[in-house]
Swiss-Prot record:
Species in which this protein is naturally found: Geobacillus thermodenitrificans (strain NG80-2)
Pfam families linked to this entry: TruB_C_2, TruB_N
The family this protein is said to belong to: Belongs to the pseudouridine synthase TruB family. Type 1 subfamily.
Entry function: Responsible for synthesis of pseudouridine from uracil-55 in the psi GC loop of transfer RNAs.
One of the record's GO molecular function terms: tRNA pseudouridine(55) synthase activity
Enzyme class, first EC level, given as a word: isomerase
Keyword tags: Isomerase, tRNA processing
Assigned EC number: 5.4.99.25
Cysteine disulfide links: none
Entry superkingdom: Bacteria
Name by which UniProt lists this protein: tRNA pseudouridine synthase B
Iron recorded as keyword: no
Amino acid sequence: MDGVLLLNKPKGMTSHDCVAKVRRLLGIKKVGHTGTLDPNVSGVLPICLGKATRIAEFLTGATKTYEGEVTLGAATSTEDADGDIIAVQTVDRTIARAEIEAVFRSLTGDIEQTPPMYSAVKVNGKKLYEYARAGIEVERPTRRVTIYELELLDEREQFVGETVSFRFRVMCSKGTYVRTLAVTIGERLGYPAHMSDLIRTASGPFQLADCVTLEEVERRAADGTVDALLIPIEQALFHLPKYEISDKVAEKVKNGALLRLPAFLQELDGPVLLVTPEREAMALYVKHPARPGVMKPLKVFR
């Protein structure tokens, strides 16, 4: 059983929990996900099965899209709704839609983020959340991320109340902390804030509408039709150049043979996916670093 399963991760489960559940339901060992979602976040979680576990690293860097909610007036220890409230300030003025949209424009493009203390980023070999649970604050390295699009989904022209919540959609690069983005939005509007809801609606080309629930996976496992849910490796790596090889060459590829680099790939910068005439993915190859005109295996899907 090889391919990518598009799971609609439910709230309340870790990404690891989902992998373990799929492993049990399908009775296979090689299962892995392509990018962690926090327990309180639902949505698109691509899960790689069998040979597809070897391509996980080529899917994790995909652009992500989320729909979420910012709540102004309260900050939390985790920057989301699960944490302890650490700051409160009544929203004592009317906030205009134009003001929020101006903040969104200011946060579009390349920005610097400091990972939250409750995150899996490692500092000195230890995950930040481990320091946080021990009550230890450590210096965290900033990271540059890209916000491609940031859109206000709420249709109101004015926002009034002791606390104010509004929904947004963001398309961003790998490694973006959307809860930290929510806090920054609040800061620029002059109030403590946290992310009160979040759902991942897309990961690269994979859309929420194409995802299945764990309950659906369980039903399909019971009637033996899980394979129909899987995206083949060749399709999952749609963004990579393809090179069709004969069945004879495919046998050599299985053994990790070096191959002549075809003319149309001379400018290749990164991996190319080798496929059979039947579109079966055989391997990922890259230019040989020391032998011009030759390519060597990076990953072979034996």
